[in-house]
């Protein structure tokens, strides 16, 4: 299950941002997850809930925004937002398309709290 290694890297990235901003804890982690990223949202949530317990993210809520697939057709030049996992142009049925968005997982925002000293 590669979601564990993905969450491990995500938490490491969160810890780096917290350290750079002198934060005591992270309370919210917002990510954008593309439908073609190969990551299963429910498994990612489970892995996050497990790994966060021993980190600065232990009180954090993970918010996952699913990013639909966005393609550009090389034949008719139409840009399409697709909810299904296909690279066929819905306008002209061409397979000559290029993926513009929906393949990545990105850390979008962190909510952090400072020390109260």
Curated annotation (Swiss-Prot):
Residues that bind Ni(2+): 2
The entry's keywords: Metal-binding, Nickel, Zinc
Keyword Metal-binding: yes
Residues the record lists as binding Zn(2+): 73, 76, 89, 92
InterPro entries, alphabetized: Hydgase_Ni_incorp_HypA/HybF_CS (IPR020538), HypA/HybF (IPR000688)
BP GO terms, sorted: protein maturation; protein modification process
PROSITE patterns xrefs: HYPA (PS01249)
This protein's record includes keyword Methyltransferase: no
GO terms, molecular function: nickel cation binding; zinc ion binding
Pfam families referenced in this protein's UniProt entry, alphabetically: HypA
Family: Belongs to the HypA/HybF family.
Protein function: Involved in the maturation of [NiFe] hydrogenases. Required for nickel insertion into the metal center of the hydrogenase.
NCBIfam families given in the database record: hypA
UniProt name for this protein: Hydrogenase maturation factor HypA
Protein's gene: hypA
